[in-house]
Amino acid sequence: MDSQQYNSNINLILNDEHHTETLNVDKKILIEKCEYFSRMLTQFSEINADTITIKVVDSNIAKNVIMSMFSDIDIYKNIGNCCDWKYLLLLYKCCDFFNISFDITKLNKLLVPNEGFELLLDIIDIIGYNYDMIELIINNLPKNYDLGKFPRELLETLYDHSTSYNIVSGSLDRTIKIWNVETQDFNSKIFTKLSKTLRYFPINKEQIFDNNIKCMDYSHKFNQIISGSNGGIKLWNIDNREVIKEFQCDYKINDICFSPDGKSCVCANKFLSIYDLDNGRRKVLNLTRIKSIGCIKTCVCWTSDNIIACGDSDGVIEFWNAETNLIIKWCQVSKSRISNISFSPDRSQIAVSNQTKIILYDSIFDKKILEIKNSYIINFAYSPTEDVLVLIDGYLIKLYNCRTGNLFRTFNLYDCSSQNTMYFSLQSKIHFSPTGNQIIFTCDTKNENLVGIWNWKLNDDIIYLKGHQKQITSLCIIPDSENSTNKRIMNMLKNQ
């Protein structure tokens, strides 16, 4: 292109289904400021054109976007040809079409009427289904929308990231309580006493068991909780609070975890035991490493359909193939007991902790990424929405960037001015809420055993849930199955 062509003006005719706008603009500025026009006017047949016709989603908005290259125009300010929500969505489409940057955070709190939901889905499909976009779908989902239009994977994600959730806590007082976060109360009690025969009890009745609750896990596949105690495993239906099945065992259960498909579970004790939850058959993974005799399995997680990771009391991490009963690999990561093991939500990291440090590895456990050292680590958890790791260190709650290892927030639970001082015990647990803005943890005072809820984003006062008579030993977060949207999603998942 010669200098005269490069510096000449060009006519742009912007057409939508109902309207046409015409612009006469500087070709040089278009090329310099917009990749779309740079490619069009230097590489394609339009290189020598004086007039170009472009089909756009909205000619007025497209004109505004193009003119922002030539003057200081706030493109996010509605120019008045449609309502605010529609303007913002069409603006994104125009910016995406012309490959012009758009501030995605402008969409985060957007509310659209039912008739705008399909347009919203079109925009989200372009952006991608990240956490903010999932929350946008949840907040705008029409009451009678046909959920059958969504693929199963999206339905599961919507259910797991519901903003309406319950907290489930198990205790040495032999109870499991399901707490409703909005009412700050528990809506039912499940008193657990191991019995040889399964009996049905109404929700307002108590059923007494022999053994303390040691550990729990939740499966969204069937909306079930599994609990382990010193002598028994129970499978619970969340919807009606009934015991579905129970399995007796003659060993102490240190940790329990559902398989990804929800059809089996793995228990950690001296060995790994896998239970088929349909028929109750138990398979023991009991091959031993050299020098592993006498070690116990302290924590466990299911990494994929067939692979199980567990931590041992001698500081070793093992990976087992659940089908072949063989150890795939093992690694000495510490000289002391492994207390926790967890995958990041995006499955790119696996974190392992002992008393004084958390070590982050890549997902296949071949490369150590970083170490986070502390004084007395009790428990940790990944955020479901950000690159954030939260941990309990002594009396402190600490927040780290899990990619860099940088500490960016600390909260001290200990209040020396209070006569009823709170503290973390060795059994304390910590989790994020599904939205990632709240941290849920267990703690104790001299006379009380508590569940705390802290909105660390807003730095609100902590809400404490009281009800357990003895120390809380397990904690999990579940979608609120009474929420109407959650009910519809769960019913759709069950019927697919």
Curated annotation (Swiss-Prot):
Keyword Secreted: no
Domain called BTB: residue spans: 8-78
Keyword Repeat appears in the UniProt entry: yes
UniProt KW keywords: Repeat, WD repeat
InterPro entries in alphabetical order: WD40/YVTN_repeat-like_dom_sf (IPR015943), WD40_repeat_CS (IPR019775), WD40_repeat_dom_sf (IPR036322), WD40_rpt (IPR001680), WD_LIS1/nudF_dynein_reg (IPR050349)
WD repeats: 149-189, 208-248, 250-285, 291-330, 333-371, 422-464
Pfam families (alphabetical): WD40
Family: Belongs to the mimivirus BTB/WD family.
Name of the protein in its database record: Putative BTB/POZ domain and WD-repeat protein R61
Organism whose genome encodes this protein: Acanthamoeba polyphaga mimivirus
